[in-house]
From Swiss-Prot:
All cells and tissues of the developing embryo. Later in development, expression is higher in midgut, brain, nerve cord, and gonads. Transmembrane segments: none annotated. This is Actin-42A. The lineage of its organism: Eukaryota, Metazoa, Ecdysozoa, Arthropoda, Hexapoda. It comes from the Eukaryota. It catalyses: ATP + H2O = ADP + phosphate + H(+). GO terms for biological process: mitotic cytokinesis; ovarian fusome organization.
Length: 376
């Protein structure tokens, strides 16, 4: 493993998107949807070379004739056959590498069940014959990417959100909180409130359009009530969006009502705390001596933290909850959509990390449980 020519592969498997590339790069080479599609109907055209499954963008583009499955639900792998297909697609079609020639760094959700880490390890060594691998917790990588080893990460992606306090590079499992409210739920909510305006979006294809509207036009209001009043009294907050068929729709208070559910999950009919309160609760579960460091290093990560205005709103909400003298700093790096992957790229290319890899030899000697001893 000491020859420097071989780049490690970094694969961040999210509920919505898979990010993959080479350690040492500053951005992932491949970003594609974590979906596997299977044909709904038998092919009628002879010699069309019909495949029995499609992955990623190809599945997305043929979604009209396929049944789509997401093998990762709420950040945790639930379907291993499909997951294997996604990894196969990642190595052979997206990165075009032979996995038996590269060490592979995989990411996992906080509180990932032990059996799952073992299964990931087993598939990498037995199916793909990787020479070495490692499993790292997503939020910890985001913190590394921001240049810190202590802080609390609010990682919110497509399928799940977590608040993860980290001290000197170690996640504190007793204080990690999970919130099943993320990008997918916000897209669903936007579909619902646009329907109230008289626009109908129902199919999975139309859902992609709504996701695009969400990503381009939504923002977080600093003061929700005041923003609602502004929206009601003037058209200054209205924006138009052109649908693929040329029809133009107008969207007003939906722009900030949609992501407001991150702070008020009751909008979605959920009895949960908002992201600000979850972050605060997570900090309060930690030792009193380290709370100051967590308040001063609150790092946002993941695609669902990309809304304009979210950092200022978090600052305001957490300041209201915390002791009045506490210094609070919300860190929102511009590249936070990919900060898990970037942290993995940094980690896997550190010279000090090279002894941390689980080698094929160690795996052959100890079996899948080696992952609990080497990756924590």
């Amino acid at each position: 493993m000491c020859d420097e020519e071989v780049a490690a592969l970094v694969v961040d498997n999210g509920s919505g998107m898979c990010k993959a590339g080479f350690a040492g790069d500053d951005a992932p080479r491949a970003v594609f949807p974590s979906i596997v599609g299977r044909p709904r109907h038998q092919g009628v055209m002879v010699g069309m070379g019909q495949k029995d499954s499609y992955v990623g963008d190809e599945a997305q583009s043929k979604r009209g004739i396929l049944t789509l499955k997401y093998p990762i639900e709420h950040g945790i792998v639930t379907n291993w056959d499909d997951m294997e297909k996604i990894w196969h697609h990642t190595f052979y079609n997206e990165l075009r590498v032979a996995p038996e020639e590269h060490p592979v760094l995989l990411t996992e959700a906080p509180l990932n069940p032990k059996a799952n880490r073992e299964k990931m390890t087993q598939i990498m060594f037995e199916t793909f014959n990787t020479p070495a691998m490692y499993v790292a917790i997503q939020a910890v990588l985001s913190l590394y990417a921001s240049g810190r080893t202590t802080g609390i990460v609010l990682d919110s992606g497509d399928g799940v959100s977590h608040t993860v306090p980290i001290y000197e590079g170690y996640a504190l499992p007793h204080a990690i909180l999970r919130l099943d409210l993320a990008g997918r739920d916000l897209t669903d909510y936007l579909m619902k409130i646009l329907t109230e305006r008289g626009y109908s979006f129902t199919t999975t294809a139309e859902r992609e359009i709504v996701r695009d509207i969400k990503e381009k036009l939504c923002y977080v209001a600093l003061d929700f009530e005041q923003e609602m009043a502004t929206a009601a009294s003037s058209s200054s907050l209205e924006k138009s969006y052109e649908l693929p068929d040329g029809q133009v729709i107008t969207i007003g208070n939906e722009r900030f009502r949609c992501p407001e559910s991150l702070f008020q999950p009751s909008f979605l009919g959920m009895e949960a705390c908002g992201i600000h309160e979850t972050t605060y609760n997570s900090i309060m579960k930690c030792d009193v001596d380290i709370r100051k460091d967590l308040y001063a290093n609150t790092v946002l990560s993941g695609g669902t933290t990309m809304y304009p205005g979210i950092a200022d709103r978090m600052q305001k909400e957490i300041t209201a909850l915390a002791p009045s003298t506490m210094k609070i700093k919300i860190v929102a790096p511009p590249e936070r959509k990919y900060s898990v992957w970037i942290g993995g790229s940094i980690l896997a290319s550190l010279s000090t990390f090279q002894q941390m890899w689980i080698s094929k030899q160690e795996y052959d000697e100890s079996g899948p449980s080696i992952v609990h001893r080497k990756c924590f």
